[in-house]
Amino acid sequence: GFRLQIFSASTRQAAEDARNRAKQQLSRDDIFIDFEPPYFKVRIGNFKTRKDAEKLRDTAKKQGYETPFVVETQIQTSPQ
């Protein structure tokens, strides 16, 4: 699946602060902090298609996020 990465930091606290800001600015609850040493990465969504993630990328840019980008990664899916 795909997620939108909006932030990367070397400390968990900085990533948590960014996640909290994103929750308010983008009105989403599906915001995750993924630790890929040495960085904590703030990523949004559980998108099955790149196109859906790109829609959120465009919205994030309008909200002031300068360099959001789509990443292919494992996502959480709900059972059908």
Give the location of each predicted region.
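Extracytoplasmic
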Residues: 11-41, 46-80
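Acidic/histidine-rich, surface-exposed loop or edge segments in extracytoplasmic proteins
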Residues: 1-6
